Design a protein with these regions (language model features):
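NTP-binding/hydrolysis catalytic cores, primarily Walker-type P-loop NTPases
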Residues: 1, 204-247
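Primarily NTPase-proximal linker/entry elements flanking Walker-type ATP/GTP-binding cores
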Residues: 1-82, 86-89, 100-107, 111-114
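Switch II (G3) loop of P-loop NTPases
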Residues: 56-59, 78, 82-93, 101-148, ...
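Short, solvent-exposed amphipathic alpha-helical segments in soluble enzyme
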Residues: 70, 99-102, 149-150, 178-182, ...
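Conserved ATPase-coupling elements of RecA-like P-loop NTPase cores
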Residues: 94-96, 140-146, 173-175, 200-202
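Phosphate/Mg2+-binding loops and adjacent switch elements
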Residues: 156-177
Length: 247
């Protein structure tokens, strides 16, 4: 529904001859998506000034793998001083998975189980350009878990909190998740699992309704490759061809 509406809006802005030119029409579609769907430009740490970004979301959406992708990008490609902090003490396997990635990337990883412990670790990471915080998956229906997570993030005081959601989630569930996780004041969204669906209308509907900016899209499990910065071209590609490889 959303994709069709945006395509119609793009078509209304050009005459029939221009619509026949796919390159021109794609540019018009990018312009329309830029106006209607907000994007953030991604995490933007400044060298020499610590930036803390925390990822939160429900179970199984790929937060830990996404943290690893971001860590690899910023540490290996942008040559920033990165550190990892995990607040997920429920899943030992997830912590060990992140530890393997941290060792490969060459960044420190610490685990915190309590608010005061998390705050102390953040002090240790004071010389880092970017601290990425992984959190335990919380059910949108488990208010106690959300309160515990809120207490941990209050101690961490992230510069930005990002809500991670799966693109193959029904739009009704996306709405409920966003409403429940709003207590954490997420500044943006990362959508994962774009490789597991070709129906992006619900995701786009959600972004239009909530007005919350999109930061990244993840398209698979490969670290660090399967993550794309959200751009108008990427969104236009999702609407037309189901492709995320757009500049």
């Amino acid at each position: 529904r959303t994709a069709a509406a945006l395509i119609r809006m793009a078509a209304e802005r050009v005459d029939n001859r221009v619509v026949q030119d796919p390159r021109v029409f794609a540019e018009r579609l990018r312009m329309v998506s830029r106006k209607l769907i907000r994007i953030t430009g991604g995490i933007r740490p400044m060298p020499g000034k610590r930036h803390v970004a925390a990822l939160c979301g429900t179970t199984g959406v790929g937060k830990t793998t996404t943290v690893a992708k971001l860590a690899a990008r910023f540490a290996l490609q942008e040559h920033l001083r990165v550190a990892l902090l995990t607040l997920d003490t429920y899943r030992i396997a997830a912590t060990e998975q992140l530890r393997v990635y941290a060792d490969i990337i060459g960044v420190p990883l610490k685990v915190a189980a309590a608010p005061d412990e998390a705050a102390a670790i953040l002090d240790e990471f004071g010389d880092r350009d970017l601290v990425l915080v992984d959190t335990a998956g919380s059910s949108q229906f488990n208010l106690e878990q959300l309160r515990d997570l809120q207490a941990l993030l209050t101690a961490v005081r992230p510069d930005e909190t990002i809500l991670v959601m799966a693109a193959n989630t029904p739009v009704e569930d996306l709405r409920v998740v966003a409403a429940r996780f709003s207590v954490l004041s997420p500044a943006s969204i990362i959508f994962t699992k774009l490789d597991e669906t070709r129906r992006y209308g619900g995701m786009l509907d959600f972004l239009l309704e909530r007005g919350i900016p999109l930061a990244y899209c993840c398209t698979g499990q490969n670290v660090p490759d399967d993550i794309e910065l959200a751009t108008p071209g990427l969104i236009a590609g999702l609407m037309t061809e189901g492709s995320t490889n757009r500049e």
